[in-house]
Amino acid sequence: MAAVLVVMASIAGSAQYSKKTLVAHRGASAYAPENTLAAYRLAIEMGADFIEQDLEVTRDGVLICLHDASLERTTNVAKVFPDRFATIVVDGKPRKTWLANDFTLAEIKRLDAGSWFNASFAGERVPTFDEAVALVKGKAGLYPELKTPEMYLLRGVNLERLMEAALDRNVLRGPKADRRTPVILQTFSQNTAVRLAQLKIGVPIVLLLDDNNPFESIDRLRQWKGIVQGFGMPKSLVTKAPQLLNWSHASGLTVTPYTFRPDAVQPGFTDVTDEMEFFLKKLGVDAVLTDSPDRFPQQ
């Protein structure tokens, strides 16, 4: 935590949102398998301002769009590679897992990433980040999350440097970047947020929070100004600790709550559209992450 006390110059010259903003959580993931090109394509069609990608890394160092560090939840890896599992202990019990970082891109491309969601999506593949960029570029912004960076460091993989190279390779930062495709990086890792700022990554950084309020005062929160440009937090934290929104805005930082889903609407709202409208217009948050981009309230 001491590293965050270092005063740094702001890495982004302007706020990351120009209006109340719709971020498609893993694409239009209520209607298509998360983190697939099908989900990203549908989110674009539904008018999303930004498309979120969760990023993991293959054994041969390629950024792929995948939420979990392992492959078994959203692919048929256990069927295609039944003997390539690692054994981990969860709640005192051994469990098989197929870590993405143990497989090459070519091997991962053999997997079906759609059938788990619906048979109509059979044959969808795990996309690379570059493939996601190619689809989204010029149509919406990119909202990648750097997943489990500490695990990758233990495996000799520098996720921040891979992200930096991807931004340059796809011309996503600097004067030649396409203004129609802004990029916002997000991470739960405080250390990663600091390292990205130290790299002068050149795009806004959002630090993600969990259900617990880490800031007992506005002064503690303001220590992040100049390192990150905003916070992402559970929508429940926005309501139970409303001072976070006030402190963030008073510090020039944005707030983006997650995740708005039709099947997980908080009590007191008629539907997910009503819920998002309350957060955006009444509470004054800057953006929302939702699985259902088509339910975003009219602005």
Regions found by a protein language model. Name each.
Residues 1-10:
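Bacterial N-terminal signal peptides
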Residues 11-299:
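Phosphate-group recognition and catalysis centered on beta-loop-alpha active-site segments
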